[in-house]
Amino acid sequence: MAEKAIRLGGESTADAIVSAVDSLYPEHTFEDKEFALKHNDDEIAVDTNFAAQSFWKDAILRFFGKRSAVLGLILIVVIVLLAVFGPGMNSYTYSGQDLSQKNFAPRVPGIERLGILDGSEKMSTTTGSKSVNAYVEKGKDDVYYWFGSDLYGRDIWTRTWEGARVSLIIAVAAAVIDMVIGMSYGLISGYFGGRVDMVMQRFLEVANGIPRLVIVTLLLLVLQPGMVTIIFALMLTEWVGMSRIARAEMLKLKDQEFVLASRTLGAGSFFIIFKEVLPNIIGPIITQVMFSIPTAIFTEAFLSFVGLGIPVPQCSLGSWISELYNSFTTHPYQIIPPIVVMSLLMLSFNLVADGLREALDPKMKSM
């Protein structure tokens, strides 16, 4: 056997095994296929409690396990669908006026038979209050305003959802632009460090110290007021918070092993920043974007309310609320729809952002 072992040393491992077995069992000829590895997955014990699961799959499951986040997501989907299709669900346009049908109360076909939303409203008089139905008084039996009409005979339903569409476009566009600018600025500042970081952070402090209202006012003096001007104004101020988050994440990751390995292999700075580090901080970035959208909605509404927003006949939720504010004491039902829509929109984005923060943060996994 010793001689055979020495003789087998020059052969390949597989041939050596076959030769050794043949020498032990000369009466039987073994084929190579008899030495093939047979797989039987049924006999392999797998611990399902600790089975491998991707980060994003786990984050999605945790997000949908939070009821408030799911509720916020449903509200966002419903409002977005109504903002897209709502203005076309009746025959009115957002800019159309009919002074003969001004200040009509809400009236919905079918529901009016129940005695609610039938076009009647209570009016205060010197002797008390009485119920008035403008549809009946003016012979408009075939006219329906689901949310009522305003002082100029414009459909509140159509203008509310048109305003929601404009507000969403402004908020989402501003948030995405803020993400791109702030994320790039913060990653570059944190990666290079030293004097580069010091100069960039001083510029950041100066930009953050300029009041937003001053920037918007100056822009309105130079540019035409409108959607692009508001987006540009929000872009110039809201990216600061995003850059600080990106810089903080970069400072935590730039000395990690995977970054050092890429540097050792000769990868360039921008490859490391945007190919290696960026995918690992996308969770906090997405969360910050979701939090910045309701902030942009509120800022746009505030600017429109003080007369620095969307010019008529266009409308956003803020400018629409500003227009209806003058009729609040006489026709309070007019201002309720845009206020409710804007409140639900801001609440739903905050709920989704809070759910994403918990789902994408590994530190909160056990909470």
PLM region descriptions:
Residues 149-367:
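Alpha-helical transmembrane segments of integral membrane proteins
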